[in-house]
Amino acid sequence: MGLMHRVLLLATFALLCMHAKAAGFDHDKVPRTVERGGGARQLRTATMSDDEARVSKLPSFIESFVKNRKIESWIQNKVTDDFVLSELKLVRLPGTSLADDPNFKLFQKFKIGGWLEEKATTTKAWENLGLDSLPFDQVSKIDEFKTYTQYVTVLNKKASKLDIDQWHGLLSGGSPEELMAKAMILRTLGRDVLERRVMLGGHVVVPF
């Protein structure tokens, strides 16, 4: 039996236990509630609502867990972007944006997780997304730039946990267009001019 199968069985068992607990609570409390009057009835109702809320939250937790495991599996097996797009039913239609689909965030998670796994540079991400083939004034208008922005955001957060002399190796490098894009992203993330110069390289002209 595979790991995913065992996880689903355990999650289903937990869900059934929660339902059974809620049902048992109702059965035990009914006589006492009738004897104690309106005040007790309100207390019972509030407690039931808490139990029901916990039960209703469990399926979404299971769903989130399964999705995360699936993404991890895709990353480990190095599946193609086309495979993941197909699995997530993400289809680029004329006049629409993939970013409007809730599953686009899962695709971003797959891409960023893969880059982190291989310790990819931002330049590799930039080129992998095809941003190097576009005029600079068009880059920010496509869905792929949103994914690139997320990767820079993750690395910026990682930089906050490192010594300043390690920043350069994390975010430096790239064409003038990519460096300008990174500088603009880092600015929106609250990095000042000095910090951006340290991250990108002292020779880089960064926008104020």
Curated annotation (Swiss-Prot):
**Linker region ln2: annotated span:** 158-170
Q: Where is this region: W2-motif?
A: 111-136
Indicate whether Repeat appears among the record's keywords.
yes
The primary location reported for this protein is secreted
Where does the record place it?
A: Secreted; Host cytoplasm; Host nucleus; Host peroxisome
Q: What keywords are assigned to this protein?
A: Host cytoplasm, Host nucleus, Repeat, Secreted, Signal, Virulence
GO terms under biological process: symbiont-mediated perturbation of host vesicle-mediated transport
Annotated coiled-coil positions are none
In this chain, the stretch annotated as T-region covers 170-208
Chain spans, region W1-motif: 70-92
- What stretch of residues is annotated with the motif RxLR-dEER? 41-54
State whether it acts alone or in a complex, and with which partners, per the record: Interacts with host exocyst component Sec5.
According to its UniProt entry, the function of this protein is described as: Secreted effector that acts as an elicitor of hypersensitive response (HR) specifically on plants carrying defense protein R1, through its interaction with this protein. Also acts as a virulence factor that promotes colonization and suppresses cell death induced by CRN2 as well as callose deposition, a hallmark of basal defense. Interacts with host exocyst component Sec5 and thereby disturbs vesicle trafficking, a cellular process that is important for basal defense.
List the protein's name.
RxLR effector protein Avr1
Organism listed in the record: Phytophthora infestans (strain T30-4) (Potato late blight agent)
